[in-house]
From Swiss-Prot:
PANTHER family: CYTOCHROME C OXIDASE ASSEMBLY PROTEIN COX18, MITOCHONDRIAL, OXA1. The chain crosses the membrane at residues 5-25, 333-353, 362-382, 427-447, 473-493, 520-540. Its main location: membrane. Required for the insertion and/or proper folding and/or complex formation of integral membrane proteins into the membrane. Involved in integration of membrane proteins that insert both dependently and independently of the Sec translocase complex, as well as at least some lipoproteins. Aids folding of multispanning membrane proteins. One of its GO terms (biological process) is protein transport. One of its GO terms (molecular function) is membrane insertase activity. It is found in: Cell inner membrane. This is Membrane protein insertase YidC. Interacts with the Sec translocase complex via SecD. Specifically interacts with transmembrane segments of nascent integral membrane proteins during membrane integration. Belongs to the OXA1/ALB3/YidC family. Type 1 subfamily. Keywords: Cell inner membrane, Cell membrane, Chaperone, Membrane, Protein transport, Transmembrane, Transmembrane helix, Transport. It comes from Chlorobium phaeobacteroides (strain DSM 266 / SMG 266 / 2430). InterPro entries: Membr_insert_YidC, Membr_insert_YidC_N, YidC/ALB3/OXA1/COX18, YidC/Oxa/ALB_C, YidC_ALB_C, YidC_periplasmic_sf. The keyword Signal does not apply.
Length: 579
């Protein structure tokens, strides 16, 4: 490689490291705004140290519903097992049957199983804050356990008779083969009975962390909404700080997520706005969130009904996209203008298509690396030949540098002439690498957050979505990490071999240093990245090494440039008659 190429590669490596540091959660922009409307938001706050009044005393006309017997009902379909409670008509447990935690055990996604996750929240006109999880409903359905499969459907209905004129009815609808749950709310007799004529339907409590590395999972946890055509994100990434976001308008959904799973509330009608809240616990890295839709209640009609869909399941791109509400926007694929298109329109479709024929994602990654190499082959072939020509030009270039060492302007002019005559581009060596960067960054996002690779192994790597660690130190080495991963080591070796066999335009000490420095920098960068990304870059480098061997073996002397070292201003004297 010539000096400009190596400089370009070094800059790319530095960009990688700076980019990784920039994308770390500590440096992400923090969304922390004050709410616009505060009736319901501030009502949820509890004054520290204030004595708690008996629940019934705080509920007004709802006081009689604050006592009762809790009845649990479980619905199991092909994909999950959901437990509902008559206390609050809420969800207390969601266990996914096809997805285990980092210890390969089943787990409950609901982080607040005692009080439940889903509820209605509103303020009555007499100033009482009502959270339906404090109230005992009556279950119309008698089954305590119902098993569904395929296209079978089942409905559970809860009713709360507040007064002879006022009632709340909540209905859940399940199907046998879907993560989607129908959720219907019917308020009777509440016209002009609620402050602002509105209520919130909310999921309270961040999703339980499923992975071994809790700190890493906290980097992916957030609450969000798709409001007015744009994604609103709340990331409670700092300890001991409260984050809150409240906006008015039409929302397609509100949701909260951990690394690989999401709980979303999807309205089937107009909304008044959204409310998001979050807080991080330092000791456990757990980020606790609340996501709510603000809904209006008719001031004139005695009955107000709203229908919703709940999605509680994996963050599988194809699954959430099939919902048709842009829920896939909650998946982080990087910059919308650069890396996200690569992820959504190239990587994920290619992986999905190949997975129809190949079940092992390690093999899919190898095939994908080969396909990318074939696509970039013409460009990389031209680039490599350009570098080989640059190597052949070095004696001539050194002669010019010595000849015009005191005239930089003349030297640059002559260098430009020689490059033009030889048909080479001094920066051509790093062009294929630069063009790969958006794809490489997009693959980083896909491999880091896509559930497709989770718990899929290849060779010694047990999980392609995390580093392929073979030894954990128990302590962290600055810039390297707390473990040894194999794919990055092999990848760094292939980078070194590729540089070794690639024509080098310079032979000075700086070039020798770069030959060792660049692989070392790549090793540091990839050691903490998903094993799938390391495997991809390793295989791409192996294909590049094979290509370089082929070029070296087939390039002949006729392919090398033949340039005139004379200056562009030198001209032969015209012949004339001798005198």
């Amino acid at each position: 490689m010539d000096r400009n190429s190596v400089t370009g590669l070094a800059l790319i490596a530095m960009i990688m490291i700076v980019w990784l540091q920039f994308m770390s959660p500590e440096n992400k922009p923090k969304l922390r705004t004050e709410p616009v409307k505060k009736e319901l938001a501030t009502s949820a706050a509890v004054t520290p140290g204030a004595p708690a009044a008996p629940v019934g005393d705080n509920l007004g006309i709802f006081a009689t519903a604050s006592a009762g017997a809790e009845q649990l009902q479980t619905v199991e379909n092909d994909l999950f097992k959901v437990t509902l409670s008559s206390k609050g008509a809420t969800i207390k447990s969601v266990v996914l049957k096809q997805h285990l935690d980092g210890h390969l055990k089943q787990f409950n996604l609901v982080s607040t199983p005692d009080k439940g996750a889903l509820s209605l929240l509103f303020l009555s006109n007499d100033g009482k804050k009502i959270d339906t999880r404090d109230l005992y409903f009556r279950s119309v359905s008698l089954d305590t356990l119902k098993t569904l499969s395929g296209t079978e459907r089942y409905v559970i209905r809860y009713v709360l008779d507040v007064t002879p004129e006022k009632a709340i009815a909540i209905t859940y609808g399940f199907s046998g083969n879907s993560y989607r749950i129908d959720y219907d709310v019917k308020l009777t007799g509440f016209n002009n009975a609620l402050v602002g004529n509105e209520y919130q339907v909310q999921w309270d409590g961040g999703l339980v962390y499923s992975e071994k590395n809790r700190e890493d999972e906290s980097h992916n946890a957030l609450a969000g909404s798709y409001l007015g055509g744009s994604f609103v994100k709340l990331d409670a990434s700092k300890d001991k700080e409260s984050y809150r976001e409240e906006q008015s308008g039409l929302a397609k959904w509100v949701a909260l997520r951990n690394k690989y799973f999401v709980a979303a509330i999807i309205p089937r009608g107009a909304t008044e706005g959204i409310f998001l809240e979050g807080r991080k616990t330092a000791a456990t890295h757990f980020e606790d969130y609340l996501a709510a839709l603000k809904m209006s209640v008719s001031a004139t009609e005695p009955v107000s009904s709203n229908s919703y869909s709940l999605y509680v399941g994996p963050l599988d791109y194809n699954t959430v996209k099939s919902l048709g509400v842009d829920l896939e926007k909650i998946m982080d694929f990087g910059w919308d203008w650069l890396t996200r298109p690569f992820a959504e329109y190239i990587i994920l479709p290619a992986f999905t298509w190949m997975n129809r024929f190949v079940s092992n994602y390690g093999l899919i990654i190898i095939i994908f690396a080969l396909l990318i190499k074939l696509v970039t082959y013409p460009l990389s072939m031209a680039s490599t030949k350009s570098m080989k020509k640059m190597s052949a030009l070095q004696p001539a270039l050194k002669e010019l540098q010595e000849k015009y060492k005191d005239n930089p302007a003349k030297l640059q002019s002559e260098l430009g002439r020689i490059y033009k005559e030889a048909g080479v581009n001094p920066l051509g060596g790093c062009l294929p690498v630069v063009l790969q960067m958006p794809l490489l960054f997009a693959m980083f996002y896909v491999f880091r957050s896509s559930i497709q690779l989770r718990h899929h192994g290849f060779l010694w790597a047990k999980d392609l979505s995390v580093p392929d660690s073979i030894l954990d130190f128990g302590f962290a080495i600055p810039m390297y990490g707390d473990h040894i991963a194999v794919f990055p080591i092999l990848m760094a070796i292939t980078v070194f071999v590729q540089q070794k066999i690639t024509p080098t335009a310079q032979s000075n000490e700086q070039m020798k240093i770069m030959m060792y420095m660049f692989p070392a920098m790549m090793l540091l960068f990839f050691n903490n990245l998903p094993a799938g990304l390391g495997l991809y870059y390793l295989m791409f480098n192996i294909f590049s090494v094979a290509q370089q061997f082929y070029i070296n073996a087939t390039t002949t002397a006729d392919d090398m440039p033949n340039v005139n070292l004379g200056t562009s201003s030198s001209k032969k004297k015209k012949a004339g008659p001798k005198k």
